[in-house]
UniProtKB/Swiss-Prot annotation:
Sequence similarity: Belongs to the class-II pyridoxal-phosphate-dependent aminotransferase family. Histidinol-phosphate aminotransferase subfamily.
N6-(pyridoxal phosphate)lysine PTM positions: K226
Name by which UniProt lists this protein: Histidinol-phosphate aminotransferase 2
GO MF: histidinol-phosphate transaminase activity; pyridoxal phosphate binding
HAMAP family tied to this protein: HisC_aminotrans_2
Gene3D superfamilies the record matches: Aspartate Aminotransferase, domain 1, Type I PLP-dependent aspartate aminotransferase-like (Major domain)
Reaction catalysis annotation: L-histidinol phosphate + 2-oxoglutarate = 3-(imidazol-4-yl)-2-oxopropyl phosphate + L-glutamate
Keyword Transferase: yes
Keyword annotations from UniProtKB, A to Z: Amino-acid biosynthesis, Aminotransferase, Histidine biosynthesis, Pyridoxal phosphate, Transferase
Pathway: Amino-acid biosynthesis; L-histidine biosynthesis; L-histidine from 5-phospho-alpha-D-ribose 1-diphosphate: step 7/9
GO biological process, one term: L-histidine biosynthetic process
Length: 366
């Protein structure tokens, strides 16, 4: 029996998601230690102390199911961003939410629009539900919003826009986003995926929550895996109008967020000092990456995230492999249609130093 023959039609064309290589795997493969992982856009400062304390206090309660509604976390999000708890949907990471949007609002034969070089989950979930993918060619590595509008049809149900975009780091301004939303029919859901918004400067950050008052078809998706440092716990949230949130919560799995994730999220969302430290390190170290690339005549895509994507003008796989042998893990992105590029997460100064040294050795810089 070949069970692929009885699988859902959309699933047959899928391949498993390939995550960044774990440190432990590389240690087993080549037998070295002191490995630096700059592959998955994780928080280099480690797990925040505020979250550790909150989790410790929660340990004796783990025989009980978590709060299925996430009351305390919703209250925290609502207070922080000036929204109402009934606008919030919680997810097991924002990946969970990105899939939830598609399962709630699209089905076989519907169209879902996203950009070339977009986050891999968008095409994965589109294929999984056997919807029609409309991938819009990128414009200067970023979103061609006019191309999105041109692609709209009566079958369009959902649009995904990451801002900043992963893996390219491109960024849309508030005005660009609002001009776009004003032209999208209200029966088309627009998902603004803001997984990396905390790394943008406050003066240029999009005030996306204010747009919810004007555009009822907007969903804002965020994660606590990046700036907040909770990647291993899997927690994210979406904010939308209450009717959309109600529909999402009908489809959302019960107890999709565990007790430790809910508790840690409340603690770290109130830890402004930690988030500012993370963002400041990212700003300083991003400048060092840009300087390194310019000094060594390496092309890169200017990024507003916590990563930078370098164009090596040649297949990057051998460079990636050579960096592994030097104890540095970065992210190959040939799967995104960018075989000449590597994406590097911004780490701590000493981690970035190791990358600069390793890449200089691999490329034989003076």
């Amino acid at each position: 029996m070949q069970y692929i023959n009885i699988a859902n039609r959309g699933v047959k064309s899928l391949s498993p998601y390939q995550a960044g290589k774990p440190i432990e795997e590389l240690e087993r493969e080549i037998g070295i230690s002191n490995i630096v992982k700059l592959a998955s856009n994780e928080n280099p400062f480690g797990f925040p102390e505020s979250a550790k304390k909150a989790i410790f206090e929660q340990l004796d309660k783990l025989t009980r199911y978590p709060d299925a509604n996430g009351f305390e976390l919703k209250q925290t999000i609502a207070k922080k961003f000036g929204v109402q708890p009934n606008q919030i949907t919680l997810g097991n990471g924002s990946n969970d939410l990105l899939e939830l949007f598609a399962h709630t609002f699209a089905t076989e034969g519907d169209e879902i629009i996203y950009s070339q070089y977009a986050f891999i989950v968008y095409p994965l979930v589109t294929k999984a539900i056997n919807a029609i993918a409309k991938e819009i060619p990128a414009k200067n590595w970023g979103h061609d919003l006019q191309g999105f509008l041109t692609a709209l049809s009566d079958k369009t149900k959902l649009i995904y826009i990451a801002n900043p975009n992963n893996p390219t780091g491109n960024f849309l301004t508030s005005q660009e986003i609002e001009d776009f939303l004003a032209k999208v029919p209200e029966n088309v859901i627009v998902v603004l995926d803001e997984a990396y918004t905390e790394f943008t400067r406050s003066e240029e950050r999009v005030d996306s929550f204010s747009l919810l008052k004007k555009y009822s078809n907007l969903i804002i998706s965020r994660t606590l895996s990046k700036a907040y440092g909770l990647a291993g716990l899997r927690i994210g949230y979406a904010v939308s109008n209450p009717e959309i949130a109600d529909l999402l919560n009908r489809v959302r799995q019960p107890f999709n967020c565990n007790s430790l994730a809910l508790t840690a999220a409340v603690a770290v969302m109130n830890d402004d000092e930690f988030i500012e430290k993370v963002a400041e390190n990212n700003r300083i170290e991003m400048r060092r990456y840009e300087d390194f690339c310019q000094k060594n005549q390496l092309d890169y895509i200017p990024s507003k995230g916590n990563f930078i994507t370098i164009d090596f003008k040649q297949p990057a796989a051998p460079i990636y492999d050579a960096l592994l042998r030097e104890g540095v893990i970065v992210r190959p992105i040939a799967g995104y249609g960018m075989p000449n590029h590597l994406r590097i997460s911004i780490g701590l100064p000493e981690e970035n130093d190791k990358f600069f040294t390793a890449l200089s050795k691999v490329l034989k810089f003076a």
